[in-house]
């Protein structure tokens, strides 16, 4: 299987140098995950967005392996004949022995080839395979856990496929198998147990036990080393799942996580230190003109404003031109996603805006799917009233315009008293009467099944944000995924994000965090935390994140009340910005999108694959492990111009250097004079796209001189190429 090219690791700035080039000829990559062409959670986004970059590297030697689902194949996959004789013989052999294996092309950007295994069609072998799993790995799976049983079937089918592929290949290829999450982990364990010549990688995107523990309101990060992991997993009836995850982590040639914070978590809960961190990226669409994404923001904001006009009919006593739209979105995990902190901060922000007589109004959206039975009647009525008013205004406008045209046509000025007749005034009075409302605008757009016990609604009742006229902060809970076909808010998620001013994601447990990353690539400022993978990554790479519209909330070193106060300060300072300052900040935020592009972050996966090849096939690939020296990293400096608002240019971490000088505040007029958008854009893009990555003198070098803004902190024991140590990466030491 010729690939006809080689790839030099030394060509990638910031990664450790390699003495020899890796020849990828006769090397095949299989990426195995339950979410291949099967949307369940965030791993689907990782695979979908990464496919093009990986395909560009591996060509036709890259395959994704996932479960067969009728819905997924019907809408996302084009079934094809296998392109190589070895692959065709493999599928024919498995299908002839009672399996159902499909081959096709995933209809996403990059069009990767996929192998889909029908788990249900192989259920006849479940009990036998569960017995073999017990004999091989001492992992027992209860009959009632359907998800775990599916993982067993999927794992055995994956191992069968890989073994059959190797047997059917005339020229034995070097196979790399990359497994994502515990649902695919059984296959990795079996590959090692059967001694298949396969280089294995296991990536955990979030530990099972970590998610369960954080949902239970424990002081998770301060007690990582104190948890009895077997006892905790057993009490939550996930011990068998935990064993699958832990076994996969220990069996893999290379173990990776998506962030430094998750690496520390995995080290304590899974008892293995990750070999490398592989951050998640996105496919970034660059605009030909700087103002293009600003125009998209204005267009999307207009769509949101139409919804707000209808939702707040009868109480629309605030200026929409002085209204800011904040939002939080994601899985409905009230504490893990930080919805509790956001609501408390909104209550404090409402108080500050009221006592200071601010003209700004904030509308905060909560986009979190929950159990509902229908739309709220008042919400539907609001949109109907808005449409009726629009139709009435258009009717009167047409009649007025026609009479004006006829009057001007004959060369005379119109008599304004005759432009509208009695019928027109009656129509307008009826429209005004329709806007009368006795109750406050609803907080929730749907009827909740558990209204009395819903965490968001219960908290709103406690803090008293009922969308009254006196409130400067309005709250809208939309417990459903956004859709352009919705009768309430007819926009998709991407358009909604573009129309908002600030995304707020004060998560307590967030191994990576795609929502703030999506905000960044769309030029929308966001709030993240130093307990999220995204927040830690940005703190490591940006000297002053808030100046670029990335506000890092400290939830690691502060109490819950202090974190709420810090978030309130962020939100209030954001409300004080002028429109021009927000435009400048959005420009800066959008410039960071290069940092989150798979073209940049894909190098971490590349490094993990090369490490696995070197460990599995040492006679063909060489790898010299060494600690990254102090110069292996770079922090983007503050923007060239003054910060976007007088109070925001500061580090959010309490551990920043005290000798760093804060920029001098300037009056608005001086700010405008100093700011040159084109000049600053050029400087920022030079910082982001072409940082001066230092090169090590040799593979064993462990020291380096300071250059520019290179972070010279001691490096982490987890190998993370091109990344300096962050506060989050030293949690183990901080706990002591």
From Swiss-Prot:
UniProt cross-references to SUPFAM superfamilies, sorted A to Z? UDP-Glycosyltransferase/glycogen phosphorylase (SSF53756)
What are its GO cellular component terms?
Answer: cytoplasm
| Modification comment | Phosphorylation at Ser-8 by AMPK inactivates the enzyme activity. Primed phosphorylation at Ser-657 (site 5) by CSNK2A1 and CSNK2A2 is required for inhibitory phosphorylation at Ser-641 (site 3a), Ser-645 (site 3b), Ser-649 (site 3c) and Ser-653 (site 4) by GSK3A an GSK3B. Phosphorylated at Ser-641 by PASK, leading to inactivation; phosphorylation by PASK is inhibited by glycogen. Phosphorylated at Ser-641 by DYRK2, leading to inactivation. Dephosphorylation at Ser-641 and Ser-645 by PP1 activates the enzyme.
Q: Which residues in this protein are found as Phosphoserine?
A: 8, 11, 412, 641, 645, 649, 652-653, 657, 698, 709, 726, 730
Acidic residues bias: start-end ranges: 658-681
Record EC number: 2.4.1.11
Q: Which residues bind UDP-alpha-D-glucose?
A: 205, 211, 331, 510, 512-513
State the UniProt keywords alphabetically.
Allosteric enzyme, Glycogen biosynthesis, Glycosyltransferase, Phosphoprotein, Transferase
| Record field: compositional bias (Low complexity) | 714-727
Catalysed reaction, written as an equation: [(1->4)-alpha-D-glucosyl](n) + UDP-alpha-D-glucose = [(1->4)-alpha-D-glucosyl](n+1) + UDP + H(+)
Q: One biological process GO term for this chain?
A: glycogen biosynthetic process
Keyword Glycosyltransferase present in the record's keywords: the answer is yes
Task: Work out whether the entry's keyword set contains Glycosyltransferase.
Answer: yes
The modified positions for Phosphothreonine read 700, 720
Q: Which Gene3D superfamilies match?
A: Glycogen Phosphorylase B
InterPro entries in UniProt: Glycogen_synth
CDD domains named in the record: GT3_GSY2-like (cd03793)
* Positions that bind UDP: 39, 331, 515
The positions annotated for binding alpha-D-glucose 6-phosphate are 291-292, 294, 297, 301, 501, 582, 586
| Composition skew (Basic and acidic residues), residue ranges | 682-695
Instruction: Summarize what activates or inhibits it.
Output: Allosteric activation by glucose-6-phosphate. Phosphorylation reduces the activity towards UDP-glucose. When in the non-phosphorylated state, glycogen synthase does not require glucose-6-phosphate as an allosteric activator; when phosphorylated it does.
Would you identify the family this protein belongs to, as annotated? Belongs to the glycosyltransferase 3 family.
Quaternary assembly: Part of the GYS1-GYG1 complex, a heterooctamer composed of a tetramer of GYS1 and 2 dimers of GYG1, where each GYS1 protomer binds to one GYG1 subunit (via GYG1 C-terminus); the GYS1 tetramer may dissociate from GYG1 dimers to continue glycogen polymerization on its own.
What is this protein called in UniProt? Answer: Glycogen [starch] synthase, muscle
């Amino acid at each position: 299987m010729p690939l006809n090219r080689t790839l030099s690791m030394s060509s990638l700035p910031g990664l450790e140098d390699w003495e020899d080039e890796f020849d990828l000829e006769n090397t095949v990559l299989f990426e195995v995950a339950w979410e291949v062409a099967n949307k369940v959670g965030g791993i689907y986004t990782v695979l979908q967005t990464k496919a093009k970059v990986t395909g560009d590297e591996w060509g036709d030697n890259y395959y994704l392996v996932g479960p067969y689902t009728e819905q997924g194949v019907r809408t996302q996959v084009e079934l094809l004949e296998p392109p190589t004789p070895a692959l065709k013989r493999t599928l024919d052999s498995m299908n002839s022995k009672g399996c159902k294996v499909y081959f096709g092309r995933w209809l996403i950007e990059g069009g990767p080839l996929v192998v889909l295994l029908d788990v249900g069609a192989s259920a006849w072998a479940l009990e036998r395979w569960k017995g073999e799993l017990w004999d091989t790995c001492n992992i027992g799976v209860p009959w009632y856990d359907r998800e775990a049983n599916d993982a067993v079937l999927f794992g055995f089918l994956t191992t069968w496929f890989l073994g059959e592929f190797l047997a059917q290949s005339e020229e034995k290829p070097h196979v790399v198998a990359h497994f994502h999450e515990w649902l695919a982990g059984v296959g990795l364990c079996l590959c090692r147990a059967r001694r298949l010549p396969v280089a294995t990688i296991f990536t955990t995107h979030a530990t099972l036990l970590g998610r369960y523990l954080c949902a239970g309101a424990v002081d998770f990060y301060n007690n990582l080393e104190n948890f009895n992991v077997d006892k905790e997993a057993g009490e939550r009836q996930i011990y068998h799942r935990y064993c699958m995850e832990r076994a996969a982590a220990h069996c893999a040639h290379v173990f990776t996580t998506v962030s430094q914070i998750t690496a520390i978590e995995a080290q304590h809960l899974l008892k293995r230190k990750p070999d490398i961190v592989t951050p998640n990226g996105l496919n970034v669409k660059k605009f030909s003109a700087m103002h293009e994404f600003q125009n998209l923001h204005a267009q999307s904001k207009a769509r949101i404003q139409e919804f707000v006009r209808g939702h707040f009919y009868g109480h629309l006593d605030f200026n929409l031109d002085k209204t800011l739209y904040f939002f939080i979105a994601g899985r409905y995990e009230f504490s893990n996603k930080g919805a509790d902190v956001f609501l408390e901060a909104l209550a404090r922000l409402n108080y500050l805006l009221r006592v200071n007589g601010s003209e700004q109004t904030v509308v905060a959206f909560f986009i979190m799917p929950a159990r509902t039975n229908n739309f709220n009647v008042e919400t539907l009525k609001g949109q109907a009233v808005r449409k009726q008013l629009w139709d009435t205004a258009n009717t009167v406008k047409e009649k007025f315009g026609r009479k004006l045209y006829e009057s001007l046509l004959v060369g005379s000025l119109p008599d304004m008293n005759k432009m509208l007749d009695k019928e027109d005034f009656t129509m307008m009075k009826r429209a005004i009467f329709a806007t009368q409302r006795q109750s406050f605008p609803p907080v929730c757009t749907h009827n909740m099944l558990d209204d009395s016990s819903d965490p968001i609604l219960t908290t709103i009742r406690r803090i008293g944000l009922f969308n009254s006229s006196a409130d400067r902060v309005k709250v809208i809970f939309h417990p459903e995924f956004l859709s352009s076909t919705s009768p309430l808010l007819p926009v998709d998620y991407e358009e909604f994000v573009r129309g908002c001013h600030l995304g707020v994601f004060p998560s307590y447990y967030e191994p990576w965090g795609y929502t703030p990353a999506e905000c960044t690539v769309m030029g929308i400022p966001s709030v993240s935390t130093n307990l999220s993978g995204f927040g830690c990554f940005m703190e490591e790479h940006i000297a002053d994140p808030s100046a670029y519209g990335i506000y890092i909330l400290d939830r690691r070193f502060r109490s819950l009340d202090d974190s709420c106060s810090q978030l309130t300060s962020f939100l209030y300072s954001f409300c004080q910005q002028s429109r021009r300052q927000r435009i400048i900040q959005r420009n800066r935020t959008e410039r960071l999108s290069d940092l989150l592009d798979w073209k940049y972050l894909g190098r971490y996966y590349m490094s993990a694959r090369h490490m696995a090849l070197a460990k599995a096939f040492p006679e063909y690939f060489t790898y010299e492990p060494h600690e990254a020296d102090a110069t292996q990293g770079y922090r983007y400096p503050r923007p060239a111009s003054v910060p976007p608002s007088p109070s925001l240019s500061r580090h959010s971490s309490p551990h920043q250097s005290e000798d760093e000088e804060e920029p001098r505040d300037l009056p608005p007029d001086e700010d405008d004079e100093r700011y040159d958008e084109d000049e600053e854009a050029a400087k920022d893009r030079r910082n982001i796209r072409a940082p001066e990555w230092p090169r090590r003198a040799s593979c064993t070098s462990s020291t380096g001189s300071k250059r520019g803004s290179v972070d010279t902190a001691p490096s982490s024991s987890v190998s993370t190429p091109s990344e300096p140590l962050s506060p989050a990466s030293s949690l183990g030491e901080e706990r002591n």
